[in-house]
Amino acid sequence: MKRIISLALIAVIIVGCFTACSSQGYPVAVGDFKFSQGEYAYCLSITKDKDEAVARCKTYAATKKLMNNEGISLSANYKRIVAEETDSVWSLFAGYYENIGVTKQDITSVLTYEYGKKELLDFYYGENGKNKVSDKKITKEFDNSYVGFKAIEASYIKLSDMGESVELSDNEKKKLKNNFTSMAKRINSGEITIDEANEIYNESIGLIVTQSLDTALTKQGDVLYADTFFSQVQKLDKGEAAVIESGNSIYLLQRQEITNDEDGYVFMYKSEILEKLKMSAVQKKLDNISANLEVKINKGLCKDTEEKQA
């Protein structure tokens, strides 16, 4: 009888140990790299798709493996950015992430993988990279990707005597457009500058200009402007002025040169342009590595994580 009880007790202990060990397992393992429930949950919260979340884990494992192979680690600058982004995300969404089982450290871990890709980009193609992308190529791509301009903006909406927003009449719109068109011609002829045109326009509406216009930059897809705005500005020669209507606004603008070293625009956007040019090459390296890594999925733990976000 005692032997039967002892065997039963041993069985309970074994089952208990197995359950405890399982609950402390990993939902996704890729090669030698294991991803916690919190890390998987954070990936899932971003992708909203379990297959894409697993794909991210594969990329992250490949990122770490490639960094190990090359003997590099995350730079102090990227570590600082990771810490700042983690603090920002946690300050806004801590409650949500705690509810789905994500800790602040989980976010740090995932962001560290993300910036690991940028570290690899710098290692291969950056300023001191193995296959550095020339400054000439960076400048050319920047000039193709962005346009700079100085603009005088006026609205087709005004306040009525009742304090309500109303659209300008057709005659008012025509008068405004003709005024801008006339000044654009004067700019293109060299009679006045865009800043002088700005002074003339503001004086006509009772305002005083105290400083020169700043150069604004935009690219395709910029949500601040209509879809066609970028292409309309890009068609202009540098230094050319034109009138562009966009939504409820009308612009008298002049395209600017933005690749001069003294302005610093190319340097400011260098990382973004390098990523546009070469991140796909880094991703290809990672895909080649991840294709040869064994992926193990704990369906039970994955399901637990997924149900919390359902």
Q: Language-model features: where?
A:
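Peptidyl-prolyl cis-trans isomerase
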Residues: 178-227, 264
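Positively charged n-region of N-terminal signal peptides that target proteins for export
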Residues: 1-8
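Cross-family detector of peptidyl-prolyl cis-trans isomerase
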Residues: 23, 31-37, 169, 181-182, ...
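Alpha-helical transmembrane segments
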Residues: 8-15
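PPIase-associated folding chaperone regions across multiple families
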Residues: 30, 48, 101-175, 224-310
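C-terminal motif of bacterial Sec signal peptides marking the signal peptidase cleavage site
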Residues: 16-20
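N-terminal targeting/tethering segments
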Residues: 21-111
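Solvent-exposed loop/turn and edge beta-strand elements of beta-rich ligand-binding domains
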Residues: 3, 28-36, 42, 177-184, ...
